[in-house]
Amino acid sequence: MYKKKVLNVPETPIDEDDWELKQEMVASDDGVNAIEFSRRDLTPRVKNQGRIGSCVGHSGRVVYGDTLDFDGKEPSAMWIYKKGKIHDPFPGEDYSGTTIKGACRGLIKEGCCEEKFWPYVDSEDAQMLEGAAENAAQYKIDAYYTIPKQNHDLIKKALLKETLWTSFRVHRHFYYTPKSGIVDSEKYLASENVGGHAIAMTGWKYVDGELYWEFQNSWGLLFGNLGFFYLESSLYEEILINNNGPIYIHTKLELDDEKYEDIRKRKEQEKKDRREKELKDLKRKEKIKSILRTLPWIGFGAVAIWAYFFNGVE
């Protein structure tokens, strides 16, 4: 199902002049010693990028969507993706894929419109609607910062505040991520490299005493653990590309602790309600899939049709 996903985030030299996030720029240390933390109840919902290399747009939608700037709204994945191609280091726009750095530069210079002004379809020819540029001008980030990949406490500290942005080298074993979402590091590295991919870092947990980072993917709810997966910190540090660590975006609207807590509780309830609905839908789809598999006269063809319609672009 996932082998046809486009993996085309290009590898670029690391810019040692990128600004690093400093400890004092993220206020509180409360929570960094937690065994497990996840922003999946706060982030925009899992979607499926479909057949084009728009993972930078989709992961950016999750990252920027988990800020006060877009509270109650959703950024346009297509805008982030297309503007990234304008501001990345590669000439022209007649290609699929871009870089997080290009997308960040686009967010600083041109902002990002709401999803309704450039709705997502899995086509390079998707058109923005009238008013998109004017809407985007309201949503510009101030800056972006790299967090050194070995500074686990600072990454955790940043994750307690917002989702982070990163890209990595995908190996073939990734296609077979189990429902637990936990990627086997040894099997992963033993399989071949198949391309670059951008994702949103959303949390962490410890498994048998080892730190694993949590990520939201853009391949639909059937991938991994309801669209999320976990990489051992040492594996992440080995396959990370283009930056020395995950990217933290600095937005114009900063939260005080009380306001953040109010928003967090509201978003958690909204996400809980949505997830309950998604789980019901998923169970229904699994039941349909199970029934289709028992019918020998339609076999795999029916399963393929089911996968296309029920796990396609949302």
Feature names for model-found ranges:
Residues 306-314:
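Juxtamembrane boundary at the C-terminal end of a transmembrane helix
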Residues 299-307:
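Core hydrophobic alpha-helical membrane-spanning segments
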